[in-house]
């Protein structure tokens, strides 16, 4: 089983997913890998509350202590029990934000996870990553990203909530005018 977890939408869902299999994924398909592309907690068709780069909890003490690692653990358990013809081995792969989820998969310490492949993962948004560059907040990038990721979503859905348009080529003037 090869898992990719994403905040960006796992659709097309079900058997239509084959349209996503391009490039190196076709090699895995020829080798009979079972693909799972999962919307993360609180995004698109997944229930719960989405938290941007939800922190890892090393010593979970209560059932309410959830993080992306515990979600990967639970997903892996469910897949092993409900997916026919699996060999009991799981890999988790992703790049950028999905790479962060691959790291969390490794931290889940599920014994069936044999490989984690984080490619250019989001790691520390406060130092040297997309939101902050050496501690300086990247307002334009953060604003654009938050406008797409942090919109309210009261129920699981395939529909996108429209963002408030702010069409602007001169972002300095846009923020200056906004106050």
Regions found by a protein language model. Give the residues of each.
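Loop/turn elements at helix/coil->beta-strand transitions in domains of secreted/extracellular proteins
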Residues: 1, 31-35, 86-90, 111-115
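Cap/lid segment of the alpha/beta-hydrolase catalytic domain
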Residues: 1-81, 131, 137
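Accessory cap/linker subdomain of secreted extracellular hydrolases
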Residues: 21-22, 30, 55, 62-65, ...
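Catalytic nucleophile serine of serine hydrolases
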Residues: 46, 96-97, 120
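Alpha/beta-hydrolase fold nucleophile elbow
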Residues: 83-97
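Short glycine-enriched nucleophile-adjacent loop
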Residues: 97-110
């Amino acid at each position: 089983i090869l898992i990719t977890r994403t905040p960006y939408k796992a659709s097309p869902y079900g058997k239509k997913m084959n349209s996503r299999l391009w490039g190196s994924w076709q090699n895995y398909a020829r080798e009979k890998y079972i693909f799972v592309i999962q919307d993360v907690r609180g995004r698109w068709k997944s229930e719960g509350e989405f938290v941007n780069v939800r922190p890892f909890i090393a010593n979970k003490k209560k059932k309410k202590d959830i993080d992306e690692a515990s979600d990967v653990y639970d997903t892996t358990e469910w897949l092993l029990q409900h997916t026919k013809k699996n060999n009991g081995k799981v890999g988790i792969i992703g790049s950028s934000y999905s790479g962060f989820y691959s790291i969390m998969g490794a931290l889940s310490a599920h014994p069936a996870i044999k490989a984690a492949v984080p490619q250019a993962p989001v790691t520390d948004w406060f130092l040297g990553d997309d939101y902050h560059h050496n501690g300086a907040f990247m307002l334009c990038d953060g604003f654009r990203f938050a406008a797409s990721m942090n919109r309210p979503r009261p129920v699981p859905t395939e529909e996108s909530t429209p963002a408030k348009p702010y069409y602007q080529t001169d972002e300095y003037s846009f923020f200056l005018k906004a106050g």
